[in-house]
Amino acid sequence: MAQKPVDNITQIIGGTPVVKLRNVVDDNAADVYVKLEYQNPGGSVKDRIALAMIEKAEREGKIKPGDTIVEPTSGNTGIGLAFVCAAKGYKAVFTMPETMSQERRNLLKAYGAELVLTPGSEAMKGAIKKAKELKEEHGYFEPQQFENPANPEVHELTTGPELLQQFEGKTIDAFLAGVGTGGTLSGVGKVLKKEYPNIEIVAIEPEASPVLSGGEPGPHKLQGLGAGFIPGTLNTEIYDSIIKVGNDTAMEMSRRVAKEEGILAGISSGAAIYAAIQKAKELGKGKTVVTVLPSNGERYLSTPLYSFDD
């Protein structure tokens, strides 16, 4: 049924569809389903936390229209916050590692936000440090996606229950999500574990920065994943296992899914699908594996992910 008109674009965040992968999954493997979070109005899963963090601050009297928001972001949270701020009448300033794609930078500017780039070698730590400096210098409000409880909470209240509704009458045997802030994994994982006590919750992290696995942080190309530290928004008790994914592996899977499934997905989505397929092979036929595709491939057309010689 078609949705009724809404008063504000933020009202259409959530309610994203789920699609079964048909061509990239082996016949003897479990069914793999992907939740298309890039169908949110700002183009990514981060729209959910952007609205949740702003509305929490409004309820607590921390911000009013005309105020300025500052946030360190690898891109998608910034884009979510930028469009929510534009819709609600706030100004926005974002600090971001210089290694992030040109599309991400341009999208932030298109929504009227100011962008401050930090050294790529410092990863998200550099962006976080710069945001703190700007906050202290100008008195800006910082939502702090890596610490804000509204982040995992919105996934517990929306994304998780949506999956329960979408899979009503079925059992989800494994749920996987890439860990950036860990909000999706923590919030959805909590809901699904309550409904399916035997479910396996799997964290996905970059092979080149295996911090969750006890390794050292390092530079990697899986934009949005692997912040280089364990965020306060990640419930480390919620996941049962970790799958590490390499840069090239994630990119190859993103390209395959575009060509073989008609789903144009971002780099972290490629990592999620690769990990989900590995888990599906392990579980075998008759089981159900679900993952989340955080963002759309159009956000990466200037990156090596979708650069073509001809």
Curated annotation (Swiss-Prot):
<dbReference type="InterPro" id="IPR005859">
    <property type="entry name" value="CysK"/>
</dbReference>
<keyword id="KW-0198">Cysteine biosynthesis</keyword>
<comment type="pathway">
    <text>Amino-acid biosynthesis; L-cysteine biosynthesis; L-cysteine from L-serine: step 2/2.</text>
</comment>
<protein>
    <recommendedName>
        <fullName>Cysteine synthase</fullName>
        <ecNumber>2.5.1.47</ecNumber>
    </recommendedName>
</protein>
<dbReference type="InterPro" id="IPR050214">
    <property type="entry name" value="Cys_Synth/Cystath_Beta-Synth"/>
</dbReference>
<dbReference type="InterPro" id="IPR001216">
    <property type="entry name" value="P-phosphate_BS"/>
</dbReference>
<dbReference type="InterPro" id="IPR001926">
    <property type="entry name" value="TrpB-like_PALP"/>
</dbReference>
<dbReference type="GO" id="GO:0006535">
    <property type="term" value="P:cysteine biosynthetic process from serine"/>
</dbReference>
<keyword id="KW-0663">Pyridoxal phosphate</keyword>
<dbReference type="InterPro" id="IPR036052">
    <property type="entry name" value="TrpB-like_PALP_sf"/>
</dbReference>
<keyword id="KW-0808">Transferase</keyword>
<dbReference type="InterPro" id="IPR005856">
    <property type="entry name" value="Cys_synth"/>
</dbReference>
<feature type="binding site">
    <location>
        <position position="76"/>
    </location>
    <ligand>
        <name>pyridoxal 5'-phosphate</name>
    </ligand>
</feature>
<dbReference type="Pfam" id="PF00291">
    <property type="entry name" value="PALP"/>
</dbReference>
<feature type="modified residue" description="N6-(pyridoxal phosphate)lysine">
    <location>
        <position position="46"/>
    </location>
</feature>
<feature type="binding site">
    <location>
        <position position="268"/>
    </location>
    <ligand>
        <name>pyridoxal 5'-phosphate</name>
    </ligand>
</feature>
<comment type="similarity">
    <text>Belongs to the cysteine synthase/cystathionine beta-synthase family.</text>
</comment>
<keyword id="KW-0028">Amino-acid biosynthesis</keyword>
<dbReference type="GO" id="GO:0004124">
    <property type="term" value="F:cysteine synthase activity"/>
</dbReference>
<feature type="binding site">
    <location>
        <begin position="180"/>
        <end position="184"/>
    </location>
    <ligand>
        <name>pyridoxal 5'-phosphate</name>
    </ligand>
</feature>
<comment type="subunit">
    <text>Homodimer.</text>
</comment>
